[in-house]
């Protein structure tokens, strides 16, 4: 064109050719054929693609969880067996103790089913302990015998018969005989002279003179 003004031209063919190429390059068909996904957009169209592998997650494998369940079941079974054994033991034991059925010393049994006869129940006594117990019993019996007093026996009373006889005999004697006995009982001056001179007094001379006059 010949003219004075500038001319503008738009190449539509270039933009039109770019659009399908961008679409072709940006869109990637899904492996499963269910939809298209755009690279780098982070937005999924259609069904989501499963990126998880066939292996298990990082938390744990299914095989490990099954093994743990089996171990816990075994532990529970063992506990149940223990409780069952205790229950069976309680059922086998009598409701009352052995002491209410047997008087005396008995052996200690872990299981009453071990008793074959009644003769096995009493406890055997050591002969040395029996001898020692008898000796202690005899000593205590002797002490109690000597210290024991019969309450029915009457206490012994003092006898005064001899004194009564002497008083009766004195009543029968005359006054002269009594005087002779009194003189005989008095010690003579000669016997008293043998004593120390410090004991000599005038009263002794007077007594001697009286004795001479009586003679």
Swiss-Prot record:
Tissue: Strongly expressed in stems, flowers, roots and immature siliques, but not detected in leaf blades of seedlings.
Inducers of expression: Accumulates in leaf blades but fades out from stems in response to cold stress. Rapid but transient induction in leaf blades in response to inomycin, an ionophore of Ca(2+), suggesting a transient Ca(2+) influx.
Keyword annotations: Activator, Nucleus, Phosphoprotein, Stress response, Transcription, Transcription regulation
Highest taxon of the lineage: Eukaryota
Composition bias type Acidic residues, residue spans: 64-81, 162-175
Sites marked Critical for interaction with HDA19: 188
Mutagenesis or variant effect for residue 188 to G: Impaired interaction with HDA19
InterPro entries recorded: OxStress_Response_Reg
Record carries keyword Chaperone: no
Region Kinase-inducible domain (KID): start-end pairs: 177-204
One GO location term (cellular component): nucleus
Annotated spans, Disordered: 1-132, 150-183
Positions occupied by motif Nuclear localization signal: 129-137
Subcellular location, record wording: Nucleus
Modification type Phosphoserine: residues: 188
Any Gene Ontology biological process: positive regulation of DNA-templated transcription
Domain notes: The Kinase-inducible domain (KID, 177-204) is required for interaction with HDA19.
Function noted in UniProt: Transcription activator which may regulates gene expression through interaction with the histone deacetylase HDA19.
Subunit structure comment from the entry: Interacts with HDA19; Ser-188 is critical for this interaction.
The protein's name in its UniProt record: KID-containing protein 1
Taxonomic source organism: Brassica napus (Rape)
